Design a protein with these regions (language model features):
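Alpha/beta-hydrolase superfamily serine-hydrolase fold, recognizing
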Residues: 1-333
Length: 333
């Protein structure tokens, strides 16, 4: 996968370096001493303010880093006039397998706040931002969209069920973020995500060896909030970080327009589960466009080629990215 990804990076149809400047591994926060970085692609085209696309990678919250969607970032930066931010967040296995699920989501919230404060330095328009991600990254993006108004800057998640961002601008409080809608974005694209951690944990899947990502990550399965909490006795905690339980009715709060995709042959996040989430959004009156990518498997947006699944970025991802960017152009330009 890695070698093919690098080869695709030499293809100017995927990666035309004349069309962007790259700020690589920009450190934007260091929660508990763990450096978090993002790659920022800025258009070389004349202009001072371009829409911003924030990207979060997949990997079951246990695997991968931003490199896995590097071809995607390169393709968008090469072919569209967007500032692209490819963001890393802590995985559950990081910091000696101690990261909690709310901390992971807090990294994503912090990234949005950092980008809004600083993206003007990279030719980005902080008032025209979209979030996107695939698989786990779609889940994270959905949490930003649904729960960006549920934050705290102190106290324990188990007490207040609010997310603490890993980065908050100086002199800004949780109330400021909420009252000024600082985590609001203007559009979202969610690709083959899962949106119900509570259900998976309740069934004894996510936090056990039944979840193969623990084994692949060479990590011991555990509770995602630590060993003192579980889905049976602490359902409110698990529901608080499950997007499907946090969709507001449009009369309460209008969400940004969303483009949600599935893959017809996906066995990791099957079509029926994604359609359930789309239905929940529609039932709440929220704006959503849904597309099922026929004859495709999970992770078709990954860089390079995935030999086990047969995915090929050049063949499979680019048609999907054209649809995604058509949607974003219709909402942000």
């Amino acid at each position: 996968m890695y070698l093919i990804s690098k080869l695709y990076s030499l293809d100017k149809n995927i990666n035309n370096k004349k069309n962007y400047s790259l700020s690589k591994n920009v450190i934007w926060a260091s929660p508990k001493g763990f450096d978090l970085a993002m790659d920022i692609y800025s258009p070389t085209k004349e202009g001072s303010s371009f829409p911003v696309l924030i990207m979060f990678h997949g990997g079951g919250f246990l695997l991968r880093r931003k490199y896995i969607i590097e071809n995607m970032a390169q393709y968008i930066a090469s072919n569209y006039d967007y500032v692209v931010c490819n963001v890393d967040y802590r995985l559950l296995r990081d910091q000696k397998n101690s990261v909690t699920f709310d901390e992971l989501i807090g990294d994503a919230f912090g990234a949005v706040l950092w980008i809004k404060e600083n993206i003007f330095n990279y030719k980005g328009n902080e008032g025209s931002i979209a979030v996107t991600g695939d698989s786990a990254g779609a889940y994270i993006s959905a949490m930003i969209v649904n729960s960006g108004n549920k934050i705290a800057t102190s106290g324990s998640f188990s007490d207040h069920l609010c997310i603490t961002p890993s980065y908050v601008p100086e002199s800004i409080t949780a109330e400021d973020v909420k009252n000024q809608n600082l985590l609001d974005v203007q559009a979202a694209v969610l690709s083959y995500g899962a949106y119900n951690l509570y259900s998976s944990a309740l069934k004894g899947i996510f936090e056990t060896r039944k979840n193969p990502f623990w084994t692949l990550a060479l990590s011991k399965p555990r509770g995602v909030f630590g060993n003192n909490f579980n889905a049976q006795e602490n359902s409110e905690m698990y529901k608080a970080v499950s997007p499907i339980y946090n969709i507001p009715n449009i009369d309460e709060r209008k969400l940004p327009p969303q483009f949600i995709t599935s893959a017809s042959e996906d066995r990791v996040t099957p079509v029926h589960a994604i359609e359930e989430y789309v239905k929940a959004l529609k039932d709440a009156g929220q704006e959503v466009t849904y597309w099922e990518y026929k004859d495709q498997r999970h992770a078709y947006l990954d860089s390079g080629k995935t030999f086990l699944s047969g995915n090929d970025f050049k063949r499979d991802a680019i048609p999907a990215l054209k649809k995604i960017m058509n949607f974003l152009n219709s909402k942000l330009l």
